[in-house]
Amino acid sequence: LLLVEPLLENYPQLPAAVEAGVKRVALADNLAVGGTTISKGVMGEAVRYAHEHQVSLDVVIAPRGGHSPYNDVELKMMEADLLEAQQLGVDGAIFGALTLQHQLDQEALRPLIAAAGGMTMTFSTAFDQIRPQDRGTAVDWLADQGFDHILSTGLANEDRLADWTMTKRLTDSVGLTLIPAGVAAHEAQEIATQLGTKILYGKKVLAL
């Protein structure tokens, strides 16, 4: 059974996604800039609605559009948002942080990981910026820290499938799940079959 996790912008799309039969959704604000954290009010209502319909809710945790590195103030915001999400009963958090050298920002990530306690953790598509030769070390560290999933668009390579296949080999070896991101509904089944994966993610993975 193929599990699709649509990335929705705020609350209004949530009922339609639930109606379409999804079992897991991700929510963010400002998708035009890559997605930022939704407000506390939206988060609370989304948790209530999702759980009433036996749907699992992930939220994107990002203080602004654009890529990391994040500064200290932005990291404090992310930490506070993670604690808030945890208290409101959100099921999972999607976040990431890299250094200017496109390495995992371990120092920034540690307090975020602590704040996400009790939720599943998915490393964001920032993973795509990590150089291929550094990905193995990154995946090992993320697994050690308790991450569950890694999102990747596969766009670091001209051949998405080759990129996903390489990353999946790494994630499989340490018990992490690679979730292909940026997948459109019309190609979902084919990609899932080719990769041997059961979960896909994206703004267009569900035709709403």
What are these regions (language model features)?
Residues 9-20, 66-84, 128-145, 165-202:
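Catalytic cores of alpha/beta
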Residues 11-14, 31-56, 72-75, 98-117, ...:
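Active-site-adjacent beta->alpha loops and helix N-cap segments on the catalytic face
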Residues 2-20, 26-30, 34-35:
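N-terminal beta1-alpha1 ligand-phosphate binding loop
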Residues 22-35, 82-101, 145-160, 183-187, ...:
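Glycine-rich phosphate-binding active-site loops on the catalytic face of alpha/beta enzymes
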